[in-house]
Amino acid sequence: KVTGGTIKQYDNLKLYPQGIDVLIKSIQMHDDPVTESVYPARVGIAVKGAKPDEVGRGDVISAEDVVDVKTEIELDFKKSPFYKNDIAENQGCLVSVGLQIKAAKFLSISPLKLTFEKPIVCKKNDIAVILKPESTTIRILGSGKIL
């Protein structure tokens, strides 16, 4: 999915969070080959430079320095009014940003800071949803924009 800008055949881009250099060999839109695709578009791309086991759900292909790869983020957090439990420092959770879902821990509550076990790809103002899968009631703890 093209979420911003343009992607062209033979572009040299990077696969994040790994930072692998990739070459766009071909682009398909609705089963038809195209030479470029502009936001917003759903595309299929063939890349050179990355093996299938190096690519995972939520990985991002982008020009260099457009996205951030972070192991720690700060959020403008709004707790869900339906989530009744308290949150504490060092408590574990899952964080969803785009198609990525990564394990994290709370570093601080006010302001809300999270630290990740594995790096996450994000941009400023992306929405992060915080989940507690082991919760017996509601599993969505809240959300906020990445600062």
Spell out what each predicted region is.
Residues 1-147:
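C-terminal effector/interaction modules appended to NTPase cores
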